[in-house]
Amino acid sequence: MNSHSEALFEINQRLSSHIRTMSNFPVFDPQKITNDVEANIKRMTSILKSKRLTREDEDLMKMINDCSKVLHEMLLERIMLQQDSIQFFTEKEASDSPFSNSADTIDEDDDKKIKSRRLTKKQLLVLEGWFQKHKNHPYSQKDQTNLLIKSTKLSKSQVQNWISNRRRKEKNTKVSPELAALLLTG
């Protein structure tokens, strides 16, 4: 492993560590994560300027990119959850008021019954991030499935089906060496 690969591997490990921290602990220091990510961006920028990247370096860069997207979405989700909880308690206090109008809340409940059939971008990023992290053995354990259920707000069967479909997609995209040789010569 050359010095670039070692540095990129370390950056990838640090980002993965932040993802695990955010997944496992409800309380974390966002400033610490931000400072670390900014320092890693500076390191990556200097590595990119060297223009002597190997295939392994490029693969590590792709993994870092995937981790950074997942980390970004997780931070956004945490911020939104915090804002949602503040909004919930504010609305709850307002609804406890004797001056609240119950007809408005009935109309809002009817609008919420319409559900989308596709997964949101955030859900896909969380699931894809998990898959990329566990690409060598993409079979979720019970605790991992529960974490994915909580972070994506999907049902157990939706999470399991997505993982199964993603494994199949990964398997179907791989071309055997014999077939690759035939395709290249033909």
UniProtKB/Swiss-Prot annotation:
Its main location: nucleus. GO terms for cellular component: nucleus. It is found in: Nucleus. SUPFAM superfamilies: Homeodomain-like. Residues 112-174 bind DNA. Keywords: DNA-binding, Homeobox, Nucleus, Repressor, Transcription, Transcription regulation. GO terms for molecular function: DNA binding; DNA-binding transcription factor activity. Forms a heterodimer with A1. This is Mating-type-like protein ALPHA2.
